[in-house]
Design a protein with these regions (language model features):
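Extended, low-polarity segments enriched in aliphatic/aromatic residues
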Residues: 2-61, 68, 72-80, 85-376
Length: 376
């Protein structure tokens, strides 16, 4: 079987050529022009960033992608679906204001922003998952499925539940409607280590479903698993590492469901994927803050295969030296630190991210075997 091709360029620039232009060259080297986009609606799936977070991809990159789509005759729009948790992206109105405030407007990116699952996150369509073991019908935002062509523009970084966020997470979790996100999180309920809990209640502010309870007697937090949706938002909210992912089986279930949702999105239509390994924060861009990067900026990757793309980004990251004064460096400096010889596992030991890659390959999203082609 022929290896999937992944194209790569670093962040070095020549005089007179900025990074947006270099991104356009990367896309064309990878063959995006081979997709028929003439008068086709093209969904560009990205994360607009939570208000207060500055780690998300700059709008200039989105504009570069939209420009190439328009050059090829396509009709692009930027899209994402609403969230489960508190913040500024849980309905389309707040989500649009958040996108605009973070710089994603028609004037700056050259195309409109459309929230994929509608006003309240309920405008979805059930899409059969071919070969799905965990999900038979994925609930995907209708606007995303209505598009003729699908492009993912991914900020590759760490993630407190998935281990890392790349193409598969941006597609699978990101394109799920609110009901779809709930289905993916259904089995992965977090746990609290009471010996580490300070009772600061910060995690309570992050829970949309009253799933965290403060015990007035012990002055510790508890999780009401009947109310908990399993979104993992509380994990990143805790500064004391008191909240962690549940058992490994539940975490594996989460990763497999996410892979199957991604398959539902890309199956049966032209798709193309771009990942930027830059500002590699330890947590998701869903947070209203972004911690210091755990790894150096590496570069931009592009491929028709989202799985090969994720694998290439992981491999590139694992070759890097952790940055000082970061969550990863702090974890490695702790007494009794157990080295997993893996930057993402050292940052989030219970994430089980490899399960997602393995399952994605099993169900036919793509291949983990790739050829890396570098362009200057």
């Amino acid at each position: 079987m022929e290896k999937s091709k992944v194209y790569f360029t670093d962040f070095r620039t020549r005089l007179g050529e900025g990074l947006p232009s270099k991104l356009k060259r990367l896309m064309k080297a990878a063959g995006i022009q081979n997709i028929d986009m003439d008068h086709k609606f093209v969904a560009i799936k990205l994360h607009f960033g939570e208000l207060g977070n500055l780690g998300f991809l700059r709008p200039n990159y989105a504009k570069a992608v939209a420009d190439v789509v328009k050059e090829l005759g396509g009709v692009p729009f930027l899209t994402d679906c609403n969230t489960l948790y508190p913040g500024n992206r849980k309905n389309a109105i707040e989500h649009m204001y958040c996108a605009w405030e973070n710089g994603f407007t028609p004037l700056t990116v050259g195309c409109p922003v459309i929230i994929g699952d509608g006003l309240k996150g309920t405008d979805d369509i059930e899409v059969p998952v071919k070969g799905g073991e965990y999900v038979k019908n994925a609930k995907i935002g209708r606007a995303i499925m209505d598009a003729d062509v699908f492009i993912s523009l991914n900020h590759f970084k760490g993630h407190e539940t998935a281990g890392f966020g790349g193409a598969i997470k941006n597609i699978g979790m990101g394109c799920g409607s609110r009901a779809g996100k709930m289905e993916q999180h259904a089995q992965g309920k977090p746990e609290i280590n009471e010996s580490l809990c300070r009772g600061c209640k910060r995690c309570m502010k992050e829970c949309a479903n009253d799933g965290l309870v403060y015990d007035e007697t012990t002055h510790k937090m508890h999780i009401d698993h009947e109310k908990c949706l399993g979104c993992g938002r509380c994990i990143g909210a805790c500064n004391f590492d008191a909240i962690h992912s549940g058992d490994a089986a539940a975490t594996k279930d989460f990763n497999c469901r996410m892979a199957e949702y991604a398959k539902a999105v890309v199956d049966g239509r032209p798709n193309f994927h771009i990942s930027l390994v830059v500002d590699v924060s330890p947590n998701c861009d869903c947070h209203c803050e972004n911690d210091a990067p755990i790894l150096p900026n590496i570069g931009m990757f592009a491929s028709f295969d989202p799985l090969a793309l994720d694998q290439a980004c992981v491999d590139a990251c694992l070759k890097q030296t952790p940055l000082p004064n970061s969550q990863l460096a702090d974890a490695m400096a702790k007494e009794g630190f157990c080295d997993h010889y893996d930057h993402f596992e050292n940052t989030t030991p219970n994430a089980e991210y490899k399960t997602c890659l393995e399952h994605a390959e099993k169900i036919g999203i793509g291949s983990r075997d790739y050829e890396l082609i570098k362009i200057s």
